[in-house]
């Protein structure tokens, strides 16, 4: 849960279309999980999908580059609705699925950066640059 990190870590949230968004979303999820800059004592990256957990357990078992990815399952879409990501430009399924959207939340729980990316590019370096402004 996001609240587990409150007061402890800066958090990157990556809302995405999940299993159907191959390869772009899978690649970003893997990059966030495998990039040591996002997995430190001060920071964590969480990928948020609306797919069922068992579906992703199967995907991760076959795609070892995803094993370090921290995945949150938003099957009810309550987090996606709360962060208002279901109707942004990057969503290919407006109203029902998030697209390719990032949030940086500081240790105090304040959203410090938001980026919706219809191009679905890998964003690690851009996110790190934004996170460095929090220090």
Model-inferred region functions:
Residues 4-7, 39-40, 64-65, 96:
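Extracellular/periplasmic catalytic domains that process cell-envelope and extracellular macromolecules
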Residues 23-72, 78-81:
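Structural microenvironment flanking redox-active thiols in thiol-disulfide oxidoreductases
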Residues 67-70, 85-91, 95-103:
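Structural micro-motif
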Residues 3-5, 85, 117:
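Residue-level structural signal for beta-strand termini and adjacent loop
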Residues 2-30:
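Short active-site neighborhood of thiol/selenol oxidoreductases, capturing the structured segment around
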Residues 94-135:
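Thiol-/selenol-based redox modules, centered on thioredoxin-like
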